[in-house]
Amino acid sequence: MPKEKNHLNLVVIGHVDSGKSTSTGHLIYKCGGIDKRTIEKFEKEAAEMGKGSFKYAWVLDKLKAERERGITIDIALWNFETAKSVFTIIDAPGHRDFIKNMITGTSQADAAILIIASGQGEFEAGISKEGQTREHALLAFTMGVKQMIVAVNKMDDKSVNWDQGRFIEIKKELSDYLKKIWLQPRQDPFIPISGWHGDNMLEKSPNMPWFTGSTLIDALDALDQPKRPKDKPLRLPLQDVYKIGGIGTVPVGRVETGLLKPGMVLTFAPMNITTECKSVEMHHESLTEAEPGDNVGFTVKNLSVKDLRRGYVASDSKNDPAKDTTNFLAQVIVLNHPGQIQKGYAPVLDCHTAHIACKFDEIESKVDRRSGKVLEEEPKFIKSGEAALVRMVPQKPMCVEAFNQYPPLGRFAVRDMKQTVAVGVIKEVVKKEQKGMVTKAAQKKK
């Protein structure tokens, strides 16, 4: 994988039938890392299964199935290249229960493509109070996705028939909603596409001569390379931990801040486990150092797969190591809670890759969500649309950080009743000092 090109992690989000798989499959198929042999194999299988109308979603279904079977699937299959950048697609399917994954997924995304179905009734369902379009856009914002491209898909639908009026109507309604969330004017490009036929994906569409903007691939190429916080101390939330025969215990995750190097003595919070990092790999290649944005696997000495789990955070034991949390203060915005939230409420928080219940211990004040000005001290409750400063207590060991120091570990979503009821940003953390396990390998390096 050449390091020279910009490297961006891309999340593709949208309502469940917006045509996400087809559009994503199309990009990977045309610009991506799928070799001809694999495509021929998939095409043959598709024809045998009577899915002869083989369109790009099938590619994605096959990749997903292979990915679910094990870790060996080559991550390159999820990559595609443009003139300036290499994109890795972080999957974020649209169903409600996938929103949790999306919270952990988008916290690693540099940019998002929001795919909107333009069909009559379809767009309206997605943008309705119950639809997922709003929730997805909101989550992308809360989770720090700074750049977004809106692809208005299914322009070939019979009810739309490449109509400019429909595109303008959708753009206006969605822009108004996005403005409310972002709190400042932005220039997110809107592009009318057909993920099925490929209109405006790689080439200008002859069916929409009225559209003068760029194609999807050009818009992707124009995205800015995010600034990576290399000079901060290491923080690497674990996504998974594998046991690999002949190699040992391999935690996997994305470097959020700092650098990870072989030979480093790592401390894993919240359990305060310290050991040595033996080697670091990305895309099956050894690295001498991994930097922010890199999705890596690394081997550790003297630990079993049972010692580590998803949600733990790897850090440099000699440079501001990560710790367990006693409590933290957060600004919480309630989005769609049917009732009132009072102190004592203990929903599940999704913060980086951790998924842990936290108690609203004290609602300290109600604040204006735009200016942060205090509106009421110690309110009895908060409800939808309101923002508050809340002192929160994790109900199990958990590692979080203040947003201004380590942004990816300082924002969270509050999940309850199968939906995101609130989002928050952590202002300050009271950390817990504790004795922990130090492996032989780490003691030798002291």
UniProtKB/Swiss-Prot annotation:
<keyword id="KW-0547">Nucleotide-binding</keyword>
<feature type="binding site">
    <location>
        <begin position="14"/>
        <end position="21"/>
    </location>
    <ligand>
        <name>GTP</name>
    </ligand>
</feature>
<dbReference type="GO" id="GO:0003924">
    <property type="term" value="F:GTPase activity"/>
</dbReference>
<dbReference type="GO" id="GO:0005737">
    <property type="term" value="C:cytoplasm"/>
</dbReference>
<dbReference type="Pfam" id="PF00009">
    <property type="entry name" value="GTP_EFTU"/>
</dbReference>
<feature type="region of interest" description="G2">
    <location>
        <begin position="70"/>
        <end position="74"/>
    </location>
</feature>
<feature type="region of interest" description="G4">
    <location>
        <begin position="153"/>
        <end position="156"/>
    </location>
</feature>
<dbReference type="InterPro" id="IPR009000">
    <property type="entry name" value="Transl_B-barrel_sf"/>
</dbReference>
<comment type="function">
    <text>This protein promotes the GTP-dependent binding of aminoacyl-tRNA to the A-site of ribosomes during protein biosynthesis.</text>
</comment>
<dbReference type="InterPro" id="IPR054696">
    <property type="entry name" value="GTP-eEF1A_C"/>
</dbReference>
<feature type="region of interest" description="G1">
    <location>
        <begin position="14"/>
        <end position="21"/>
    </location>
</feature>
<feature type="region of interest" description="G5">
    <location>
        <begin position="194"/>
        <end position="196"/>
    </location>
</feature>
<feature type="domain" description="tr-type G">
    <location>
        <begin position="5"/>
        <end position="230"/>
    </location>
</feature>
<comment type="similarity">
    <text>Belongs to the TRAFAC class translation factor GTPase superfamily. Classic translation factor GTPase family. EF-Tu/EF-1A subfamily.</text>
</comment>
<dbReference type="InterPro" id="IPR004539">
    <property type="entry name" value="Transl_elong_EF1A_euk/arc"/>
</dbReference>
<dbReference type="InterPro" id="IPR000795">
    <property type="entry name" value="T_Tr_GTP-bd_dom"/>
</dbReference>
<feature type="binding site">
    <location>
        <begin position="153"/>
        <end position="156"/>
    </location>
    <ligand>
        <name>GTP</name>
    </ligand>
</feature>
<dbReference type="GO" id="GO:0005525">
    <property type="term" value="F:GTP binding"/>
</dbReference>
<dbReference type="InterPro" id="IPR050100">
    <property type="entry name" value="TRAFAC_GTPase_members"/>
</dbReference>
<dbReference type="InterPro" id="IPR004161">
    <property type="entry name" value="EFTu-like_2"/>
</dbReference>
<keyword id="KW-0251">Elongation factor</keyword>
<keyword id="KW-0963">Cytoplasm</keyword>
<dbReference type="GO" id="GO:0003746">
    <property type="term" value="F:translation elongation factor activity"/>
</dbReference>
<protein>
    <recommendedName>
        <fullName>Elongation factor 1-alpha</fullName>
    </recommendedName>
</protein>
<keyword id="KW-0648">Protein biosynthesis</keyword>
<dbReference type="InterPro" id="IPR009001">
    <property type="entry name" value="Transl_elong_EF1A/Init_IF2_C"/>
</dbReference>
<feature type="region of interest" description="G3">
    <location>
        <begin position="91"/>
        <end position="94"/>
    </location>
</feature>
<feature type="binding site">
    <location>
        <begin position="91"/>
        <end position="95"/>
    </location>
    <ligand>
        <name>GTP</name>
    </ligand>
</feature>
<dbReference type="Pfam" id="PF22594">
    <property type="entry name" value="GTP-eEF1A_C"/>
</dbReference>
<dbReference type="InterPro" id="IPR027417">
    <property type="entry name" value="P-loop_NTPase"/>
</dbReference>
<dbReference type="InterPro" id="IPR031157">
    <property type="entry name" value="G_TR_CS"/>
</dbReference>
<dbReference type="Pfam" id="PF03144">
    <property type="entry name" value="GTP_EFTU_D2"/>
</dbReference>
<keyword id="KW-0342">GTP-binding</keyword>
